[in-house]
Curated annotation (Swiss-Prot):
Catalyzes the transfer of an acetyl group from acetyl-CoA to tetrahydrodipicolinate. It catalyses: (S)-2,3,4,5-tetrahydrodipicolinate + acetyl-CoA + H2O = L-2-acetamido-6-oxoheptanedioate + CoA. One of its GO terms (molecular function) is tetrahydrodipicolinate N-acetyltransferase activity. It holds the Pfam family DapH_N. The lineage of its organism: Bacteria, Bacillati, Bacillota, Bacilli, Bacillales. It comes from Bacillus thuringiensis (strain Al Hakam). Keywords: Acyltransferase, Amino-acid biosynthesis, Diaminopimelate biosynthesis, Lysine biosynthesis, Repeat, Transferase. This is 2,3,4,5-tetrahydropyridine-2,6-dicarboxylate N-acetyltransferase. One of its GO terms (biological process) is lysine biosynthetic process via diaminopimelate.
Amino acid sequence: MKMMDANEIISFIQKSEKKTPVKVYIKGDLKEVTFPETVQAFVNKKSGVLFGEWSEIKTILDGNSKYIVDYVVENDRRNSAIPMLDLKGIKARIEPGAIIRDHVEIGDNAVIMMNATINIGAVIGEGSMIDMNAVLGGRATVGKNCHVGAGAVLAGVIEPPSAKPVIVEDDVVIGANVVVLEGVTVGKGAVVAAGAVVTEDVPPYTVVAGTPARVIKEIDEKTKAKTEIKQELRQLNPEK
Protein backbone atom coordinates (compact mmCIF):
# COMPACT_ATOMS: atom_id res chain seq x y z
CA MET A 1 0.00 0.00 0.00
CA LYS A 2 1.31 3.43 -0.96
CA MET A 3 0.96 6.44 1.29
CA MET A 4 -0.17 9.55 -0.59
CA ASP A 5 2.21 12.48 -0.55
CA ALA A 6 0.79 15.55 1.19
CA ASN A 7 1.28 17.68 -1.92
CA GLU A 8 -0.70 15.13 -3.96
CA ILE A 9 -3.60 15.50 -1.53
CA ILE A 10 -3.38 19.29 -1.53
CA SER A 11 -3.39 19.33 -5.34
CA PHE A 12 -6.35 16.93 -5.46
CA ILE A 13 -8.39 19.12 -3.10
CA GLN A 14 -7.43 22.31 -4.93
CA LYS A 15 -8.39 20.98 -8.36
CA SER A 16 -11.51 19.06 -7.36
CA GLU A 17 -14.93 20.40 -8.22
CA LYS A 18 -16.53 21.54 -4.97
CA LYS A 19 -20.00 19.99 -4.72
CA THR A 20 -23.20 20.38 -2.72
CA PRO A 21 -25.14 17.21 -3.59
CA VAL A 22 -28.73 16.95 -2.39
CA LYS A 23 -31.62 14.52 -2.35
CA VAL A 24 -35.01 16.20 -2.83
CA TYR A 25 -38.48 14.71 -2.42
CA ILE A 26 -41.05 16.54 -4.54
CA LYS A 27 -44.78 16.39 -5.20
CA GLY A 28 -47.11 18.21 -7.55
CA ASP A 29 -48.10 18.17 -11.20
CA LEU A 30 -44.77 16.74 -12.27
CA LYS A 31 -45.74 15.81 -15.82
CA GLU A 32 -45.33 19.52 -16.60
CA VAL A 33 -41.76 19.66 -15.27
CA THR A 34 -38.68 19.01 -17.44
CA PHE A 35 -35.57 17.70 -15.70
CA PRO A 36 -32.08 18.13 -17.22
CA GLU A 37 -29.83 15.11 -17.81
CA THR A 38 -27.46 16.32 -15.08
CA VAL A 39 -30.19 15.68 -12.47
CA GLN A 40 -31.26 12.12 -11.67
CA ALA A 41 -35.05 12.22 -11.53
CA PHE A 42 -37.06 9.24 -10.28
CA VAL A 43 -40.56 10.65 -10.65
CA ASN A 44 -44.08 9.79 -11.68
CA LYS A 45 -46.90 12.20 -12.46
CA LYS A 46 -47.43 13.29 -8.86
CA SER A 47 -44.29 12.64 -6.79
CA GLY A 48 -40.66 11.65 -6.98
CA VAL A 49 -37.08 11.98 -5.83
CA LEU A 50 -34.29 14.06 -7.34
CA PHE A 51 -30.52 13.62 -6.93
CA GLY A 52 -28.11 16.29 -8.04
CA GLU A 53 -26.24 19.51 -7.38
CA TRP A 54 -28.20 21.95 -5.22
CA SER A 55 -27.69 24.91 -7.56
CA GLU A 56 -29.32 22.99 -10.43
CA ILE A 57 -32.17 21.55 -8.40
CA LYS A 58 -32.91 24.91 -6.79
CA THR A 59 -33.29 26.36 -10.29
CA ILE A 60 -35.82 23.62 -11.10
CA LEU A 61 -37.77 24.23 -7.88
CA ASP A 62 -37.85 28.01 -8.32
CA GLY A 63 -38.73 27.82 -12.01
CA ASN A 64 -41.58 25.36 -11.54
CA SER A 65 -43.19 26.63 -8.36
CA LYS A 66 -46.65 26.57 -9.93
CA TYR A 67 -46.29 22.83 -10.58
CA ILE A 68 -44.23 21.69 -7.57
CA VAL A 69 -46.47 22.19 -4.55
CA ASP A 70 -44.11 20.87 -1.87
CA TYR A 71 -40.59 19.52 -1.42
CA VAL A 72 -38.14 18.38 1.26
CA VAL A 73 -34.36 18.71 0.86
CA GLU A 74 -31.81 16.33 2.40
CA ASN A 75 -28.32 17.87 2.50
CA ASP A 76 -25.25 16.76 4.46
CA ARG A 77 -22.38 18.79 2.97
CA ARG A 78 -21.56 22.14 1.36
CA ASN A 79 -18.87 22.78 -1.27
CA SER A 80 -17.34 19.41 -0.45
CA ALA A 81 -13.99 18.73 -2.10
CA ILE A 82 -13.56 15.04 -1.29
CA PRO A 83 -16.18 12.39 -2.04
CA MET A 84 -16.76 9.35 0.12
CA LEU A 85 -14.87 6.15 -0.72
CA ASP A 86 -16.79 3.68 -2.91
CA LEU A 87 -17.04 0.71 -0.55
CA LYS A 88 -18.62 -1.85 -2.88
CA GLY A 89 -15.36 -3.44 -4.01
CA ILE A 90 -13.52 -3.33 -0.68
CA LYS A 91 -12.71 -6.80 0.74
CA ALA A 92 -13.19 -5.73 4.35
CA ARG A 93 -15.95 -5.57 6.98
CA ILE A 94 -17.23 -2.00 7.15
CA GLU A 95 -20.07 -1.33 9.58
CA PRO A 96 -22.84 1.32 9.27
CA GLY A 97 -21.98 4.89 10.15
CA ALA A 98 -18.28 4.74 9.27
CA ILE A 99 -17.14 7.88 7.45
CA ILE A 100 -14.38 7.06 4.97
CA ARG A 101 -13.13 9.64 2.47
CA ASP A 102 -11.91 8.88 -1.03
CA HIS A 103 -8.24 7.95 -1.53
CA VAL A 104 -8.16 5.81 1.62
CA GLU A 105 -6.54 2.38 1.25
CA ILE A 106 -8.07 -0.52 3.17
CA GLY A 107 -6.42 -3.94 3.20
CA ASP A 108 -8.22 -7.25 2.86
CA ASN A 109 -10.08 -8.51 5.94
CA ALA A 110 -9.74 -5.23 7.78
CA VAL A 111 -12.62 -4.19 10.05
CA ILE A 112 -13.99 -0.64 10.28
CA MET A 113 -16.51 -0.27 13.09
CA MET A 114 -19.46 2.10 13.55
CA ASN A 115 -18.76 5.85 13.44
CA ALA A 116 -15.05 5.50 12.75
CA THR A 117 -13.78 8.49 10.75
CA ILE A 118 -10.98 8.00 8.24
CA ASN A 119 -9.60 10.94 6.28
CA ILE A 120 -8.04 11.16 2.84
CA GLY A 121 -4.67 9.48 2.36
CA ALA A 122 -4.98 7.15 5.36
CA VAL A 123 -3.80 3.56 4.95
CA ILE A 124 -5.15 0.55 6.88
CA GLY A 125 -3.32 -2.75 6.55
CA GLU A 126 -4.70 -6.25 6.11
CA GLY A 127 -6.58 -7.64 9.09
CA SER A 128 -6.49 -4.45 11.15
CA MET A 129 -9.51 -3.28 13.15
CA ILE A 130 -10.47 0.37 13.57
CA ASP A 131 -12.91 0.40 16.47
CA MET A 132 -15.96 2.58 17.16
CA ASN A 133 -15.50 6.38 17.01
CA ALA A 134 -11.80 6.12 16.26
CA VAL A 135 -10.33 8.88 14.08
CA LEU A 136 -7.57 8.42 11.52
CA GLY A 137 -6.42 11.79 10.25
CA GLY A 138 -5.03 12.50 6.81
CA ARG A 139 -2.17 10.16 5.82
CA ALA A 140 -2.25 8.22 9.11
CA THR A 141 -0.93 4.73 8.41
CA VAL A 142 -1.84 1.54 10.27
CA GLY A 143 0.02 -1.69 9.51
CA LYS A 144 -1.25 -5.27 9.36
CA ASN A 145 -3.10 -7.09 12.16
CA CYS A 146 -3.46 -4.06 14.41
CA HIS A 147 -6.26 -2.93 16.70
CA VAL A 148 -7.01 0.79 17.09
CA GLY A 149 -9.32 1.10 20.09
CA ALA A 150 -12.62 2.92 20.42
CA GLY A 151 -12.29 6.70 20.48
CA ALA A 152 -8.58 6.67 19.67
CA VAL A 153 -7.15 9.49 17.54
CA LEU A 154 -4.24 9.13 15.14
CA ALA A 155 -3.43 12.73 14.27
CA GLY A 156 -3.54 13.68 10.61
CA VAL A 157 -0.97 15.63 8.64
CA ILE A 158 -1.82 17.31 5.35
CA GLU A 159 -0.48 20.75 6.17
CA PRO A 160 2.29 21.61 6.60
CA PRO A 161 3.10 19.14 3.80
CA SER A 162 6.62 18.55 5.13
CA ALA A 163 5.32 17.10 8.42
CA LYS A 164 5.62 13.35 9.04
CA PRO A 165 2.35 11.46 9.54
CA VAL A 166 1.53 8.94 12.27
CA ILE A 167 2.81 5.47 11.42
CA VAL A 168 1.58 2.42 13.32
CA GLU A 169 3.59 -0.66 12.40
CA ASP A 170 2.29 -4.25 12.21
CA ASP A 171 0.77 -6.14 15.17
CA VAL A 172 0.20 -3.06 17.35
CA VAL A 173 -2.64 -2.74 19.87
CA ILE A 174 -3.80 0.79 20.69
CA GLY A 175 -6.21 1.12 23.61
CA ALA A 176 -9.40 3.14 23.84
CA ASN A 177 -9.19 6.96 23.81
CA VAL A 178 -5.47 7.04 23.01
CA VAL A 179 -4.13 10.11 21.20
CA VAL A 180 -1.10 9.65 18.96
CA LEU A 181 0.37 12.98 17.86
CA GLU A 182 1.64 13.74 14.37
CA GLY A 183 5.10 12.46 13.49
CA VAL A 184 5.02 9.53 15.92
CA THR A 185 5.89 5.98 14.90
CA VAL A 186 4.50 3.16 17.03
CA GLY A 187 6.87 0.22 16.60
CA LYS A 188 5.93 -3.32 15.60
CA GLY A 189 4.15 -5.37 18.25
CA ALA A 190 3.83 -2.50 20.74
CA VAL A 191 0.88 -1.93 23.08
CA VAL A 192 -0.40 1.55 23.96
CA ALA A 193 -2.50 1.56 27.13
CA ALA A 194 -5.96 3.15 27.15
CA GLY A 195 -6.03 6.92 27.54
CA ALA A 196 -2.34 7.46 26.78
CA VAL A 197 -1.13 10.54 24.90
CA VAL A 198 1.77 9.48 22.69
CA THR A 199 4.17 12.32 21.87
CA GLU A 200 7.32 10.33 21.02
CA ASP A 201 8.13 7.20 19.03
CA VAL A 202 7.24 3.92 20.73
CA PRO A 203 9.92 1.18 20.57
CA PRO A 204 8.86 -2.18 19.12
CA TYR A 205 7.50 -4.81 21.53
CA THR A 206 7.05 -2.42 24.45
CA VAL A 207 4.07 -1.29 26.51
CA VAL A 208 3.57 2.45 26.97
CA ALA A 209 1.11 4.26 29.22
CA GLY A 210 0.40 7.68 30.68
CA THR A 211 0.35 11.33 29.65
CA PRO A 212 2.76 11.73 28.03
CA ALA A 213 3.21 8.04 27.29
CA ARG A 214 6.30 6.34 28.69
CA VAL A 215 7.61 2.78 28.39
CA ILE A 216 6.49 0.75 31.42
CA LYS A 217 7.70 -2.69 30.34
CA GLU A 218 8.52 -4.94 27.45
CA ILE A 219 5.90 -7.25 25.96
CA ASP A 220 5.61 -10.50 27.91
CA GLU A 221 3.38 -13.57 27.62
CA LYS A 222 0.76 -12.12 29.95
CA THR A 223 0.49 -8.97 27.82
CA LYS A 224 0.27 -11.04 24.63
CA ALA A 225 -2.62 -13.03 26.09
CA LYS A 226 -4.51 -9.88 27.13
CA THR A 227 -4.05 -8.16 23.75
CA GLU A 228 -4.55 -11.10 21.38
CA ILE A 229 -5.83 -10.25 17.90
CA LYS A 230 -8.71 -12.62 17.05
CA GLN A 231 -8.74 -13.59 13.38
CA GLU A 232 -12.30 -14.89 13.74
CA LEU A 233 -13.51 -11.28 13.88
CA ARG A 234 -11.90 -10.56 10.52
CA GLN A 235 -13.36 -13.41 8.49
CA LEU A 236 -15.59 -12.60 5.52
CA ASN A 237 -18.08 -14.76 3.67
CA PRO A 238 -16.49 -17.04 1.06
CA GLU A 239 -16.50 -15.42 -2.38
CA LYS A 240 -19.20 -16.77 -4.68
